[in-house]
Amino acid sequence: MNTSPVYFTDFRCHPGLNQQQKLRKLLLKAGMDKIDFQDKFVAIKMHFGELGNLAYLRPNYAKTVADLVKELGGRPFLTDCNTLYVGSRKHALEHIDTAYTNGFSPFSTGCHVIIADGLKGTDEVEVPVEGAQYCPTAKIGRALMDADSVISLTHFKGHESTGFGGAL
């Protein structure tokens, strides 16, 4: 398997170089400015957290990515799919309310929130999974499939049910 470069930064801030500026620098170092985003719909895939939860990437990081995409001519939007479990992201209306409550609004991030698999989580496209032995297909939210590009803005975390999450 081929490996990809992995870029890291620390959380220390210095005068004139805050976290958002560091993220922008990382994105440029990774070659984001070499991607053709001109007039393309760009999904920024992330999760907006549950109500009362703080274990998600802050909206200002999403804004940094969205601003760079717009600078490069793209049309960014934030997206995620509804959850299978009962919570504040089980259907699109509560999911969007949760996103806004947790700070992910068009006013704070500079782009819209679109729930990728629609109102009830049934707006999906079945796609083949190459080389899969047990799950030959996967259902993907239609908005993700309709996007011209997808940027995955994720974090890694321990999860009660699976041992890890947030990086899927």
Q: Which residue ranges define each predicted feature?
A:
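N-terminal and secondary-structure boundary signal
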Residues: 1-168
